[in-house]
Amino acid sequence: MSGQGPQRRLLGSPNATSPTTPHFKLAANQTGPRCLEVSIPNGLFLSLGLVSVVENVLVVAAIAKNRNLHSPMYYFIGCLAVSDLLVSVTNVLETAVMLLVEAGALAAQAAVVQQLDDIIDVLICGSMVSSLCFLGAIAVDRYLSIFYALRYHSIVTLPRAWRAISAIWVASVLSSTLFIAYYNHTAVLLCLVSFFVAMLVLMAVLYVHMLARARQHARGIARLRKRQHSVHQGFGLKGAATLTILLGIFFLCWGPFFLHLSLMVLCPQHPICGCVFQNFNLFLTLIICNSIIDPFIYAFRSQELRKTLQEVVLCSW
């Protein structure tokens, strides 16, 4: 894709150079504004991708190993790990192939490179869509477990969870294929941006509602213990901080990428928007960082999963 769209690293992009250290660069055209461009070294990009791969492989292995983790909640977490794993693997693969082509170690015709790039882009886009979907699915699952605790196991059954998981993967593959095929069409870009906004709003509404319920529960306990003010205030600050971190990381890691897509629709030729387009590889790096952070937010907080993870790591040595 061009510099105004999601860049195809194999075919060249404004950031497709090979710096050895990250740096900030001010670039200016004769008729345009001075732009702050953040160059991401290929070594750093590959290293972050490999860290994400290792983390998410361990999460998937731990869930597969421990039968106590074979429940809808952990299946959603496992699928999120698979999605993040695919995000990292496909980006690392694309960067590695790009470096081989640039170094002359991989000789291929332009048509072959184009086809390979299309396949990798479909995988990247599909894994991103599925990752967002499973973040939303985890939020819905947690919401149901709190507000429908007595009926939760009859509502969220394994067959229903597997149907939801299958639907998410199918929808992700189809939507990513359409996106890569018609990425220049405004309607496709608007659909992707709208999808991100919908996921952000869904997660914000559900988690804020869950926080309100938890604070209400804490007030009830505080009344019984006659320490209402201190307990309620402490819990409120802790809950608000957790919610801010969860939604803040989601927005900071995914927001720039979808801002990029929004500007492709709103101002594809504007010089200031062009400054944003030049940092597309930085936005991809933020998504890789999100894949690294997700296991700490959703998986590693589980004591059962951490225990199984230790067993997996010890068995591998």
Swiss-Prot record:
Where in or outside the cell is it found? Cell membrane
Can you list the GO cellular component terms from the UniProt entry? plasma membrane
Q: Does the keyword Nucleotide-binding apply?
A: no
Extracellular-facing ranges: 1-37, 94-118, 184-191, 267-279
Lineage of the organism: Eukaryota, Metazoa, Chordata, Craniata, Vertebrata
Give membrane topology per the record. Multi-pass membrane protein
Q: List the source organism.
A: Vulpes vulpes
| All ranges on the Cytoplasmic side of the membrane | 64-72, 141-163, 212-240, 301-317
User: What parts of the sequence cross the membrane?
Assistant: 38-63, 73-93, 119-140, 164-183, 192-211, 241-266, 280-300
Q: Which family does it belong to?
A: Belongs to the G-protein coupled receptor 1 family.
Q: Does the keyword Manganese apply?
A: no
Q: What is its main location?
A: membrane
Q: What is this protein called?
A: Melanocyte-stimulating hormone receptor
Keywords noted in UniProt:
Cell membrane, G-protein coupled receptor, Glycoprotein, Lipoprotein, Membrane, Palmitate, Receptor, Transducer, Transmembrane, Transmembrane helix
Lipid-attached positions, S-palmitoyl cysteine: C315
Identify a single GO molecular function assigned to this protein: melanocyte-stimulating hormone receptor activity
